[in-house]
């Protein structure tokens, strides 16, 4: 995994400007039940275009008045890298433990839902990732500062393709110590 990366975060312009001006120190972590990498601050790794697409889509939905993208220099530090087989093994073991726990209390596990192939409503993944971090904390293991994973999104780019039009790498920062600085991407007016 790379150590230092550039991350891009789509947001409301006032939020980005508050960080760049020093009025706010950091972006606020997301704690939505569908945050597929668990709770934390989300970035697109090296993908300014995708961050802009996301911010503009939120404007179209009426969730952002003025779209903006802020960049960050990120040190992944102790990272749960989902490109790594050992990381995936840890996630699978956590899922198995949760399955047993939910069976014991006779409750159904949350599911990943959504009309798209990427299952945009990722409640199950969020539960598993947050549980993995909790289990590590309870057992005295070193906490992960970040999570890095591939997100397959969009339509196939041609018939029979395994590649999708909006696939990207997402980063979830669990520790703001990973952020070495914020910046305004070139070409973005203040």
For the regions a language model picked out, list residue spans one by one.
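Active-site and NAD+-binding cores of ADP-ribose-processing enzymes
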Residues: 2-7, 17-18, 24-26, 69-190
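Short, solvent-exposed loop/turn segments at secondary-structure junctions
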Residues: 13, 49-50, 77
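A general structural signal for short secondary-structure junctions and capping/turn motifs
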Residues: 32-35, 61-63, 160-163
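Extended catalytic/binding region for NAD+/ADP-ribose chemistry, centered on the ART fold
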Residues: 32-58
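Cytochrome P450 catalytic domain signature, combining two hallmark sequence patches
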Residues: 58-69
